[in-house]
Every structure is written in structure tokens, then in C-alpha cells.
From Swiss-Prot:
UniProt keyword terms in alphabetical order: Capsid protein, Host cell junction, Transport, Viral movement protein, Virion
Biased composition (Pro residues): 221-234
Record's protein name: RNA2 polyprotein
GO cellular component terms, A-Z: host cell plasmodesma; viral capsid
Post-translation changes: Specific enzymatic cleavages in vivo by the P1 encoded 3C-like protease yield mature proteins.
Region described as Disordered: spans on this chain: 213-236
Native source organism of the sequence: Arabis mosaic virus (isolate Syrah)
Family in the record: Belongs to the nepoviruses RNA2 polyprotein family.
Annotated GO MF terms: structural molecule activity
Biological process per Gene Ontology, one example term: transport of virus in host, cell to cell
UniProt key word Transcription: no
Length: 1131
């Protein structure tokens, strides 16, 4: 047979020749060979056709000498016909023959003449051409009817046509089992109307050897014409696979819509084979009234309307064992109640047969409700109303909350038109179908509650707990919930809480498919409830039963799963907040604590002893206060004026002083990086007009500057939050890893000193009766940190600004009550350094914008009116260039907006240059050379008689949308670090630590550079990266006559015990040299102050310093230079 030689080129030739109906060029097929799976499939097919002559012609030659490697192109003539003539065409653009190979074969036939002589004649085979490509099949849809029912019917038809093939597959799957051999074949009407695309589908879903099929459908099913062959393509990309997944999701939504519209269609889905045991009384699932549940890890593919013949062989093999276990399990349950054995079986184990067939536990509509009239059917839509996939399962104290309405708006409107004003939920079913490995001990709990009830004890409907490794689990409850037709519009009728205590799977993996179904009916003033006797009996029995260990609930759980024992449920149902009126125009924010739903784990027994002692009932709900780490108080004087310093709270002292459970967790974890929630509790009062500021000072930079008078230049330069007295209790979130930049050690500080400063931004208009204080509560969960450094606040790059601004608050604008047509301006010199008296204050927002010369775009922000509720004003904000206008008619022609109740605004920056500068020259004024936001009081301010205090307004800028940035101030260039001059000694040595800092010297004059990079160092706590240093110097004497040099040495540790690294010596005549400096230590990052941590450092030694006129050091950040911990710095 010979050896075959494979290559991508030859496999592409083979695939192209054997798939001519797909089309595609040779180059496209060659690209397909890059997929290893496709290449292996083609190679396997070649192996199965080794005997073919054309295959041997293609693969028997060594690589490089075959017909596929012909320099003129693929020699199709030799591959297909065996001739030596090269296939006609341009080399490199060959195509295979468009007709079969045998059409060109010549058959030599032997014949004997009349004279007895043997002759030969040549004859070409006459092979007919294939039939022409038929046109695609299509069927138009009729116009929608003008009524709602006509629209629904048209929608049903459209969705039915889209899912035609799936429904036909289900019908084909049932035919061989529904009709045993020898019986006449009765084909359903839906099956006869099906249209199929390929003959393979018929042979796949139906046994073509059955003669009855030919009698019913001679020639097979009706087939539409074949569509045109698609062009060959490369393997699907990620985007194509994503689109296919979204299409499948849309099909699932279409199925849900059809179900909600009441369609009764076949659907191929997943169901479970029940285990060899059944429900017992000592189990794990709880419910408020009645529960029935079954589970099994094995699954198989069946139809939702499974025929009796499909489940017959399953029930026969398990019937004997099932009867024994039913007697053992139910006898103990019935013995503890007033029910008989048969009543208990009908109430709880009747669902086992439905699980076996893949059907829901809910009874059919015709069995649940009786018709209300002779010609009226049951007014219900039942079964599955919610299906979702669970991924990113919450663990610990996190709980996934799902809100949904069992009844759609269309259904409600339909029955409202019939005079029905209420809906009754008679039964609720929860089904959990897990994915993953059998025997997975991950527990999962689903709790169902009534969403409009604030008391969780009263809202509780039921819960279901299972192990994911035990397969499908189902539970059914009979709440009898009745509500108005208007309530479902609130989108929160039923609340589901999903949680796990020990989930360890990936966050992006799908754990389970959870389905929730309801059995419901619509009733009105003239309609009575029509619950059938079976459903009514189940409801009555569910309310009369009592569990053996849970109290006022029945525990029915699966038995015989792969995971032994029972899940321990721990679902945290989080609290909320609400507003409560406590006085005239005064409201209080009431925080509701979270609640814990707990089920203690216990072992199962196959049989329940009727003489066993009843255990102590465990509560299902308990009110807890979670995560309280510390507390403190802040005194407030009765006459609290603007700029008043109140108090500073140390975060570490608050936690350690409280000595709660979180402090113990902190000691155990050691290093933590928590997310703090600070709750400031104070009574609301809308008459004072006080606004406080809570400033988070992670590195203790502003404490000394606000001890007497708190200037907004400091309190608003660090992360801060506004506390309005009129709003009452306020909550603030502090991401410690982001705002501080690194983790906290439990026993001592490292770089940080986190403090909360409380100061007064706008003073009180009315003096209070006495001094008072408010309470500060600190909530956090202390878990061990995985690293020391947190999230960097800023990473240096040439295009770092994306338009978002945080904590950019303008000091209060005060409107005089006696002024009319007043205005206040906010300058857009956002890159200018703040000045407080003789000091400069560097903060992050100003430094970030100073990297650019100018900016344009849309300024978005919010206006906070901080005056008492007795004041009033109407504000219009516009953007203007070069001052303000005195022509009010012109003002209203400018683009602007009025400040509404929420205070938000969005104004495009107006400038003759389309941008406004971010800094100014010293001689320029802000009113003449920049754009401003002008807030015009077009009406007001007004206040009652006797009021004299000004009306304060605070503006916060949150974003500059669509920023039109100019060129950077220093694009990818060096920054000036320091200049040394006027040397007094010859031998000079400068020690540069592993940080960017302010260098000082007693033997020379030092001049520090002023640039955005040094400002960024100043307004952060830590920095880390690599600096490229460039040293340049000038000489005092003539060039060439000076002697001496500059020695640069890299060291690690200290001089006494450290290690020496690379070193270089540069002669003074070189006039400069370059090196690099690593910024950081063994912890990762360094502050800009001296610190005795083991790290690298640099020594610059001058042996003839007096010969130098000046030494200049430039620096440039390399790569991703990172800054951690947002703060400010005063110079």
C-alpha cells in the first residue's frame, strides 16, 4: 500500500476536492488546517480512504515532490484523472474540476467481430448532471388582528415557526415508543406539517426500516429545497461563538414567552432518573407550609410530555424497592400526625412519579381548578414563570437577591378587563438542577419570601436546601398568597435569596439552573375560588403538620444521594433603610439590620422511630448586627460656625478600643485591607443649614493645619464626604486598599496613620439650645489580605486622564440676601495649585490636570444648597469666557440649565479656543483669560423676615465628559529634580534613597524643581517604579583644565553592613552621565520621607566639587510608575 506523507497543503487539497458543494478557495481550506481538531478529522478520513486511487496519488509522494507541491499550482488533473498534463489555469489559482471524476474516465470495451477477430472500442461514461439547486422555502405570515388576542396569536405563529425543528425532533423521538410494532401508525397533525431541511434528520429521528412510515409518508417527509451552499470559513472566532450563545439565550427567552402565553408544545429538556429511595421525614428541606422534594445525580434526555412507555421500564425495576422504602419512610411521618398512611403518601410522595417523568410537581390545571361556568375554563396560567442560571454563587455573609413577579403585565391586563381584581398563588415550586461533578458537597439554599412584607418572619414562604452533587432537587409550597392586580407593577412580589456556606467553584462558572413555578388563579368580586379537592387537601394537611425538629414546618428530603448528611443553610437576608418623619420638615433615616436564616446540619436516618424524643426547635430567623468594628462620638457646639474644627477619630483606635469580634479577627488575620462603612448617626434638622465634612487623612497630612480653623483648602483636598444636617443619618464607604494604598497591620502602623477629621463647612443659621454630639459607627469585615499593596490610585502615562474626577468640591458660594440679580463664578483653572495664605497645597485633582495645557468638554456635577429649608433660590448655570455678562437677555440665549431638585447639571465649556487653560501666567487674571461656570440667581435668594445670614451653595464637579485635551505639559520628557550650586567643599557626597524626595544640603545651595511629577509624589502616600536619571554639570574654569570626576554607586542596605552594586566614574570633562534609580523597598513602595527599611539607594560622590559651577539632576519615569494612597501636601 505504501507510506502516506501528510502536510497541511495536501490535506487542504483533499478537503477541497471532497467538499466541492461547500465552495471556497484553496487558500481558505489551507487556513482551516490551522485548527488541530479539523486537521485530525480530515486526516482520519484520509486513513479510511487509503484504497482510493486519487488518495494514493495525493499522499504517496514525499513532501515537496507531489502534485500538491507543484510550483505552478495544484495539479488537479493528475490527482483526479492520473494524467500528466497540468491543469489549465494560472499557477496558484487552481480550482478542482466542477464535475465528477468518472465523467472524464474512458472505458475500453472488448468486442468480437463477425470474422472472429477481437477488437477494442473506447466509450465515455454518460453520467447525468445533478438536479438544479432548488429555491429556498418560505411561508408568509398573515396580518395581525386589531385585537390583543389577534396580536398574541400572530406572535405565537411566528415563534412556532422559528422553533419548528426542535418540536419536530421531540415528536420524532416519541413515535417509536408510542406505537409498538404491528400497530397502525397514526401521525400527529403537527408531525405531518413539519418541514425539514436535510434527509439526515429523518433517518436520525425515525427508523426508516419501519414500513408503516412509508405507508404514511411515501418517499419520506416533505422536504424543502436545499439552501445554497455556504462558503467555507475559518473556525469560528470568539465573537462568533459569543453571538451563537446569545442566540441560544434568545431562543430560551422565546420559549419562556410561549409558556407564558399558554402554549402546549413539546420541548426536549433535561430530567432526572429518581434514585432508589424516596422522601423521608428526617431530612433537610424546610417550608412554611408544605414541601415535597426529590433528587438524584443521574440525568437522561427525555421529552417534557414523556409517554408512559418511556418510563415503564424504569418503574418496573424499582417498584419493589420503592414500596419497601415508602412504607419505612412514611410510616414514621404519619405516626406523628393525625393523618393516615395513604394521606401522607398522597400529600408528599405523589410528586415522585412526576420527577421520574421530568414533569413539574405542580398538578395540571385541569386537576387543580374547576371551571367557573359552563363555557368558561380555569382562569389561570401555570407552571414555570422564572428560569435563571446561577453563577458567581455568594458565600459567607453575601446573599444573592432575586426579585420577580409570577404574573406578567399582559396577563394582568387581560384578566383585569374581565373584571378580576386579585390573584391567588395557591402553589409555589422551586427546582434546583445543579451542574458539575456528582458527589460535590457544595450546599445551596433558596429561600422564598413575600416581597411586600417587611417582617421576615411573616414574609417567609419556604426554603429548599440541597447538595449540588445530589442532582435535581424540587420543593413545593402551598402559601395561599393573595394580592391585588396592581401590586406586580412594583417588580418585587416574590423575593428569592440564594446562598451557600462552602462554595469553592470559579466565580464565572454556572452552578445550577433554578426554576420557580406557580399555580395561580385570577378572581374578582363575582368569582369564587375554585381550588380542586386534591390541592385543597394538600393545603390543609400542610398547615396541620408539624415537623419533628424544625417547628411549624415539614421536613421532607431526598434519601440515597452521593453526598451523605444534610446541608447546613446560612442565608444572610440583608437589611435596608427607610425614611421616618420625626418632626415638621424633619426626616430620619432608619437602618434595618440584617437577618440570618439558619438551618443546623444533622444526619439522616432511613427510618424515623415513632418513639424518638422531639428535639428543641431552632429559630429560623434571628436579628443580628453584622460587622460592627468600632464606634466614636463627635461633639458639636450649639453655635457651629463655618470653619469650625470638631474632632479627629483614629480608625485604629476605634477598632482596638471597641475590642469587638472584628478586632479579634484582625489579630488573627494580621494584615487586612477592609472596605469600611462609616455610619454617622445624627437627627435630621432642616432649619440649621449646617453641612459638615468628613475627611479621610490616611497619612496624617492635614492634622496640624486644621487644629484651630479648618480651611477648605485642606479638608477638601483629601478624600471627603459632605454631611448635611437636613438629611440625617448618612453612610459613607471607604475602600481602604484604594484610598490608603496598602494593608493595615494589627499592632502598629507601617506608613499610614488613618484618621477621620470632622469639620464644619457651612455654619448654622439658628443657634441650637445646647451643645450636642453625633455618633460614628465603623463597620467592616476583617479578612486576611493577600498582598501588602492595594490598588494604585494613579499610573503615570502620557494619556492618563479619562474625564472622571473624584472628591472635587468647590468651597461654598455665598449669596447675599440683599442682592438682586446676583451671580457667583467657579473658575475652571482646575490645574492651578491651591494657595492658603503663604502655603501651597498640592492635591490629586489639580496635579492630575496640570499634566495638560488646556481642556474642553462637558462639565458634569452637582449643586448642594446648604441653606435652611426657609431659604429659596432659582439658579441658572452657564459657561462664559472672560468674565460675566450684564445683559440678562443675552444670558438666557447662552446654553445653560436650571438647577433642579437633585442639583445635577451638565454644561459644555465655552471658549474661543474650544479649550480653557488649566493654569495661568503670573500676570494674568482668572476673570480675563479662562472659562468659568457662572451660577446666576435669576430668582431669589429669599428668606423670612429677620434672616441676615448668607445663603451657601456648594458645587461638586464629578466629570468632564468627552474631554478635549491639549498636548501634555511635558510629553514623555525629563523633569527637573534638583540643582546644586555654590559648593563650599571639594569632597561632596549626596545620598539619594530609594524614593523621590526634597533634597537638602548644608555645603551647597539646593534648588528643587517644580513640575507635575513632583506634585504627584507630594499628593500620594507611596510611589513605586524606576526613574531614569540624567546628571549634567557645568565647570568653573576653562574646559579641559579641570580635573576630578563624579562617582555614581548603587548600593543596597546601609554603608556598614550593606552590599555594593554597580559603580561608574565620569570625568568632569564629560559634562554629564546617565543612570537609573529603583524606587521601592522589600514591601514594594516607598514614601517620600526617610524610612529605615531595607532597600536600594544611590550615592553620588564629587571629588572636585568647587570646580563645578552647577550640578543638575533630571528624572523621567520609566514604564508604569505607580502611585498609592491619595492625600495632599502643604509646602
Amino acid at each position: 500500500m505504501g507510506k502516506f506523507y501528510y502536510s497541511n497543503r495536501r490535506l487542504a487539497c483533499y478537503a477541497q476536492a471532497t467538499n466541492r458543494h461547500l465552495g471556497g478557495s484553496f487558500e481558505q481550506w489551507l487556513q482551516c488546517m490551522e485548527d488541530s481538531a479539523f486537521r485530525a478529522e480530515v486526516k482520519a478520513r484520509v486513513q479510511s480512504e487509503r484504497e482510493e486511487v486519487r488518495v494514493r496519488r495525493l499522499f504517496s509522494y514525499p513532501v515537496g515532490s507531489g502534485p500538491a507541491e507543484d510550483p505552478r499550482g495544484v495539479n488537479w488533473a493528475y490527482i483526479c484523472l492520473g494524467t500528466t498534463a497540468h491543469w489549465a489555469g494560472v499557477p496558484g489559482d487552481m480550482v478542482p474540476p466542477p464535475e465528477p471524476v468518472k465523467a472524464q474516465e474512458v472505458v475500453v470495451q472488448r468486442s468480437v467481430g463477425e470474422d472472429g477477430r477481437t477488437g477494442y472500442r473506447r466509450q465515455c461514461l454518460n453520467i447525468p448532471n445533478p438536479p438544479p439547486m432548488p429555491k429556498p422555502y418560505s411561508r408568509p405570515i398573515g396580518a395581525f388582528a386589531p385585537t390583543r388576542s389577534g396580536f398574541i396569536r400572530a406572535t405565537v405563529k411566528r415563534l412556532t415557526r422559528e422553533r419548528e425543528e426542535s418540536r419536530a425532533a421531540a415528536l420524532f423521538a416519541e413515535l417509536p415508543l408510542e406505537y409498538p410494532q404491528g400497530a397502525p401508525l397514526v401521525v400527529p397533525r403537527g408531525f405531518a406539517a413539519m418541514r425539514w431541511t436535510y434527509h439526515a434528520t429523518w433517518s436520525r429521528w425515525y427508523d426508516t426500516s419501519d414500513e408503516r412510515a412509508l405507508r404514511t409518508h411515501p418517499g419520506g417527509p416533505a422536504l424543502p429545497p436545499l439552501p445554497p451552499p455556504p462558503p467555507i470559513q475559518k473556525p469560528p472566532s470568539f465573537e462568533e461563538r459569543l453571538q451563537a450563545a446569545l442566540h441560544r439565550q434568545s431562543c430560551a427567552r422565546a420559549f419562556a414567552l410561549e409558556t407564558s402565553l399558554g402554549l402546549n408544545m413539546a420541548w426536549v429538556g433535561m430530567a432526572t432518573i429518581p434514585s432508589t429511595s424516596v422522601c423521608c421525614a428526617d431530612g433537610r428541606t424546610t417550608g412554611g407550609q408544605t414541601i415535597a422534594q426529590e433528587a438524584d445525580p443521574l440525568t437522561h434526555r427525555v421529552s417534557s410530555n414523556t409517554a408512559p412507555g418511556r418510563a415503564q421500564w424504569i418503574s418496573e425495576r424499582r417498584s419493589a424497592l420503592r414500596r419497601r422504602e415508602q412504607a419505612n419512610s412514611l410510616q414514621g411521618l404519619a405516626a406523628q400526625t393525625d393523618m393516615t398512611f395513604e394521606q401522607a403518601r398522597n400529600a408528599y410522595l405523589g410528586a415522585a412519579d412526576m420527577i421520574e417523568q421530568g414533569l413539574p410537581l405542580l398538578p395540571p390545571l385541569r386537576n387543580a381548578y374547576a371551571p367557573r361556568g359552563l363555557w368558561r375554563g380555569p382562569s389561570t396560567r401555570a407552571n414555570y414563570t422564572l428560569d435563571f442560571r446561577l453563577n458567581g454563587i455568594p458565600t459567607g455573609e453575601n446573599t444573592l437577591e432575586i426579585l420577580y413577579n409570577p404574573v406578567s403585565d399582559e396577563e394582568m391586563e387581560d384578566y383585569r378587563d374581565r373584571g378580576m381584581s386579585a390573584v391567588v398563588i395557591d402553589a409555589l415550586e422551586i427546582a434546583i438542577n445543579p451542574f458539575g461533578m456528582p458527589g460535590n458537597p457544595t450546599d445551596l439554599t433558596v429561600v422564598a419570601t413575600y416581597g411586600h412584607e417587611r417582617n421576615m418572619e411573616r414574609a417567609f414562604i419556604g426554603s429548599s436546601s440541597t447538595f449540588l452533587g445530589n442532582g435535581l432537587a424540587r420543593a413545593i409550597f402551598f402559601p395561599g398568597l393573595q394580592y391585588s392586580q396592581e401590586e406586580p407593577r412594583r417588580e418585587s412580589l416574590i423575593r428569592l435569596y440564594v446562598a451557600s456556606t462552602n462554595a469553592t467553584v470559579d466565580a464565572d462558572s454556572v452552578l445550577a439552573a433554578i426554576s420557580v413555578g406557580t399555580l395561580r388563579q385570577h378572581i374578582g368580586s363575582l368569582h369564587s375560588r375554585t381550588v380542586a379537592s386534591s390541592v385543597h387537601a394538600a393545603q390543609v394537611q400542610g398547615t396541620t403538620l408539624r415537623a419533628t425538629m424544625m417547628g411549624n414546618s415539614v421536613v421532607v428530603s431526598p434519601e440515597g444521594g452521593l453526598v451523605s448528611g444534610v446541608p447546613e443553610a446560612n442565608v444572610q437576608i440583608g437589611g435596608g433603610s427607610s425614611m421616618r418623619m420625626v418632626g415638621p420638615l424633619a426626616w430620619e433615616n432608619v437602618e434595618e439590620p440584617g437577618q440570618t436564616f439558619s438551618i443546623r446540619s444533622r444526619s439522616r436516618s432511613v427510618r424515623v422511630d415513632r418513639n424518638a424524643d422531639v428535639g428543641i426547635a431552632h429559630p429560623r430567623m434571628s436579628t443580628t448586627t453584622r460587622g460592627l468594628a468600632g464606634r466614636g462620638t463627635v461633639p458639636v457646639p450649639k453655635d457651629c460656625q463655618a470653619g469650625k474644627y470638631l474632632k479627629t477619630l483614629d480608625l485604629r483606635d476605634m477598632v482596638s478600643g471597641f475590642s469587638g469580634i472584628q478586632y479579634e479577627k484582625w489579630i488573627t488575620a494580621g494584615l487586612v485591607m477592609p472596605d469600611f462603612k462609616v455610619v454617622i448617626r445624627y437627627p435630621a434638622n432642616a432649619f440649621t443649614g449646617i453641612t459638615w465634612v468628613m475627611s479621610f487623612d490616611a497619612y496624617n497630612r492635614i492634622t496640624s493645619s486644621i487644629s484651630t480653623t479648618a480651611s477648605p483648602a485642606y479638608t477638601l483636598s483629601v478624600p471627603h464626604w459632605l454631611l448635611h444636617h437636613k438629611n440625617g443619618t448618612t453612610s459613607c464607604d471607604i475602600d481602604y486598599g484604594e484610598l490608603c494604598g496598602h494593608a493595615m497591620w494589627f499592632s502598629a502602623t507601617t506608613f499610614e496613620s488613618p484618621k477621620l477629621h470632622f469639620t464644619c463647612l457651612t455654619g448654622n443659621n439658628k443657634e441650637l439650645a445646647a451643645d450636642w454630639e453625633f455618633v460614628v459607627e465603623l463597620y467592616a469585615e476583617f479578612e486576611a489580605a493577600k498582598s501588602f499593596l492595594g490598588k494604585p490610585n494613579f499610573i503615570y502615562s502620557a494619556d492618563a486622564f479619562n474625564g472622571s474626577l473624584k472628591f472635587l468640591t468647590i468651597p461654598p458660594l455665598e449669596y447675599d440676601l440683599s442682592a438682586t440679580s446676583a451671580y457667583k463664578s467657579v473658575s475652571l483653572l482646575l490645574g492651578q495649585t491651591l494657595v492658603d495664605g503663604t502655603h501651597k497645597v498640592y492635591n490629586f485633582n489639580n496635579t492630575l490636570l496640570s499634566y495638560y495645557l488646556g481642556i474642553g468638554g462637558i462639565v458634569k456635577g452637582k449643586v448642594h444648597v446648604c441653606s435652611p429649608c426657609t431659604y429659596g433660590i432659582v439658579l441658572r448655570v452657564v459657561s462664559e469666557w472672560n468674565g460675566v455678562t450684564n445683559n440678562w437677555n443675552q444670558l438666557f440665549k447662552y446654553p445653560g440649565c436650571y438647577i433642579e431638585e437633585d442639583g445635577s447639571f451638565a454644561i459644555e465649556i465655552r471658549s474661543p479656543y474650544h479649550r480653557t487653560p488649566l493654569r495661568l501666567i503670573d500676570a494674568q487674571s482668572a476673570s480675563s483669560f479662562t472659562s468659568t461656570l457662572n451660577f446666576y440667581a435669576i430668582s431669589g435668594p429669599i428668606a423670612p423676615s429677620g434672616e441676615t445670614a448668607k445663603m451657601p451653595v456648594v458645587v461638586q464637579i464629578e466629570e468632564i465628559a468627552l474631554p478635549d485635551l491639549s498636548v501634555p505639559s511635558f510629553p514623555n520628557d525629563y523633569f527637573l529634580w534638583v540643582d546644586f550650586s555654590s559648593f563650599t567643599v571639594d569632597v561632596e557626597e549626596y545620598v539619594i534613597g530609594s524614593r523621590f524626595f526634597d533634597i537638602s544640603s548644608t555645603t551647597s545651595t539646593v534648588a528643587l524643581g517644580d513640575n507635575p511629577f513632583s506634585h504627584m509624589i507630594a499628593c500620594h502616600g507611596l510611589h513605586h517604579g524606576i526613574l531614569d536619571l540624567k546628571l549634567m554639570w557645568d565647570l568653573e574654569g576653562e574646559f579641559g583644565k579641570s580635573s576630578g570626576g563624579v562617582t555614581i554607586t548603587k548600593l543596597c542596605g546601609d554603608k556598614a553592613t550593606g552590599m555594593d552594586g554597580a559603580s561608574r566614574v565620569c570625568a568632569l570633562q564629560n559634562m554629564g552621565c546617565e543612570t537609573e534609580l529603583y524606587i521601592g523597598n522589600y514591601a514594594g513602595a516607598n514614601p517620600n520621607t526617610a524610612l529605615s527599611l531595607y532597600s536600594r539607594w544611590l550615592a553620588i560622590k564629587l571629588d572636585k566639587a568647587k570646580s563645578m559651577k552647577m550640578l543638575r539632576i533630571l528624572c523621567k519615569p520609566r514604564g508604569n510608575f505607580e502611585f498609592y494612597g491619595r492625600t495632599c501636601f502643604k509646602v
